[in-house]
Amino acid sequence: MIVNVSSGMGSVAVTTDPGRFESTLIGLAYPASKTALNMITSQYAKAYPRMRINAVDPGYTATELNGHRGTKTVQEGAEVIVRMARLDASGPTGAFLDSEGSVPW
C-alpha cells in the first residue's frame, strides 16, 4: 500500500478549469512536483499491479506551508489519506482521489 500525498495543483485539468480556485494560483516548483508525483503514482501502479498505489489530494489544509490559511483542518485533510491507506487488495490502484472521489489528471 502506497499513498502519495498530491494536490489539485498537480492536475493540469484542475489548474486550467476557470471554475476552480486552483486556476487562479501561479506557481512553478510546487505544481510541477505534484504533477511529477502523479505520474510516478501512475507508473508504479502499472509496474506493481499487486500493490495498491494511489495519489490523494487532501484539499486546501491549514498547515505551516500556507500560513494556516487552508480551509480544512489537518484532521479533515488526513481523512482521505487514512481511508486510502486502509484499502484492501480489491481497492483501486493508479488513481488520483480526494475526499469526494476521482480527481482528473
Locate predicted features.
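Catalytic loop of short-chain dehydrogenase/reductase
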Residues: M1-P49
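Short, flexible catalytic-loop segment of classical short-chain dehydrogenase/reductase
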Residues: S11, P58-E64
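A generic structural signal for ordered alpha-helices
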Residues: T15-P18, A55, G59
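Generic preference for well-ordered secondary structure
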Residues: F21-T24, T61, V80
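Conserved short-loop catalytic and cofactor-binding motifs
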Residues: L25-L28, L65, R69
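C-terminal helical subdomain
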Residues: T35-N38, M51, A55-P58, G67-W105
